[in-house]
Amino acid sequence: RLQKIATMEELKGVLGTDVDMTVFRKLRLLESHTSYSHRGRYYTLDEIAEFDDVGLWSFRSVWFSKHGTLLATAVACVDASEAGFLAAELEAILHVSVKDALRKLASDNRISREPLSGRFLYCSSDPPLRKKQIRARQLYEAEAGFGPLPLGPGIRLVPDELKAAIILFFSLLN
């Protein structure tokens, strides 16, 4: 427990075994996480990981998620977003390439891939939420003065000015 992260080989050495399943059984008992970066090569304990507001934690450029795999993490981020994500935005948050993962999730209908201004916007597979995300993104992109969509721990938040504009827009529809 002095070491924050470890590989399978390191864990085998500590446990005195050559068998992966022995390590997996022990990890299951200890409530552990597998990295979503570095091809899942690293492990950490739940009590060590200090997840941020998005559910991410890194140590020495190795990334972990409270949601588990890269696929599960991408779905959680997309579903939590108020305006969906472009692939580059999600890559900036997750610190790994996400294009293949997003294509797989879209083909499995776990998220929705929507064309928008010559790019793809990744949204929730839930139709009402997806509709809100697309509207929020369209409205956001129509406002040239806002600059890029905020990322990082505040990814769930749309600027107050945009929220006011969305409320005004929806009130005009009724």
Segments from the language model and where they lie:
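Conserved donor NDP-sugar-binding/catalytic core segment of glycosyltransferases
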Residues: 90
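Long, charge-rich, low-complexity intrinsically disordered regions
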Residues: 1-80, 84, 95, 103-174
